[in-house]
Amino acid sequence: MSVKTYRRGVILICAALCGALTASLNIWSIFQKPLMEAYGFSPQSVSFAYTIVIAMIGLSGPIGGWLQRKAPAHIIMTVAGIGFGLGWFLTGFASTIPVLYISFGLLVGVCDGICYNLALAIATRWYPDKRGFANGVALAIMAIYPLFTAPMGNMIIENFNVSIAFNIVGVFCIVGFIVLSRFLKMPAADFKPEGWNPPAESDTKRVKNYTSGQMLKTPFFWTLLLFFGTVACTGCVMLSTVSLVGQVQAGMDAATGALMVGIFAIANGRGRLGLGAISDKLGRFQTMFVAVAVTA
């Protein structure tokens, strides 16, 4: 294995692990019921905090893309990662709804969008020859993260309280981002893996680059926005409520609810990794069509 191959493999894993830290959001469902019981919050008010997070992730994604052109990747990831962990930590002191919305909804949401966007960008740019594979590996690692953290989070809540659980998640994320970010960097603009050559010009001559303004004027952009928004919302609803629904409607205890989050993570991870690799062979749109058809 060449040094260059080894290095991009390390960067891929570190970027994926940074993305996995943002997947702490996927264990939100184990916090909802304890949070309501601790402070008397209504289910609607607690659920709206997650809605704010998702909105902020969508709005901050373009900011992350802009920052990638202005500062080194490891600096952006470190700063945004610390902000992400700080949001979780401060949520441990959120005894009122406004504080919950600011610390968790706004701070965690904005920093999550920046970190998530950057993690995937780093992963795929180091693998121009296997973009689907790199994207699949990164997303799979992010997806299986709750398999380990959901039971641990539930154990902390049961042995201490929900506030301390938020504090611990926050500190863990801050330390994780600081350590992992040190290994991140973007490849040079002309980077290409050893033994791989970009497609001939004749194969890519129909590709056209758009500015942000031009992109917003195309019907294709709005079609994709509606499509991806619908798919993402479906997944987010499942992720944010799987434990709570199991406890409230199926009578599960907290430990079983956390186990459900883990099972969901396994299925999610296998799908992301497999479909990412398949898309390199079958094509992006064809794979997407099959995946959505099966899900529906």
Predicted regions and their residues:
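Extracytoplasmic
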Residues: 10-43, 60-64, 149-150, 230-231, ...
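Conserved MFS/SLC helix-loop-helix module at the cytosolic interface between two early adjacent transmembrane helices
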Residues: 59-98, 279-285
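Hydrophobic core of transmembrane alpha-helices in multi-pass small-molecule transporters
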Residues: 20, 87, 98-114, 229
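Residue-level signature of mid-helix packing/kink "hotspots" within the transmembrane helices
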Residues: 26, 54-62, 146-147, 265-273
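Extracytoplasmic gate region of multi-pass secondary transporters
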Residues: 28-35, 210-277
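Intracellular juxtamembrane helix-capping segments at the cytosolic ends
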Residues: 35, 105, 113-127, 134-135, ...
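Helix-loop-helix hairpin linking two adjacent transmembrane segments in secondary transporters
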Residues: 137-191
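Flexible cytoplasmic inter-helical loops of multi-pass small-molecule transporters
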Residues: 186-209
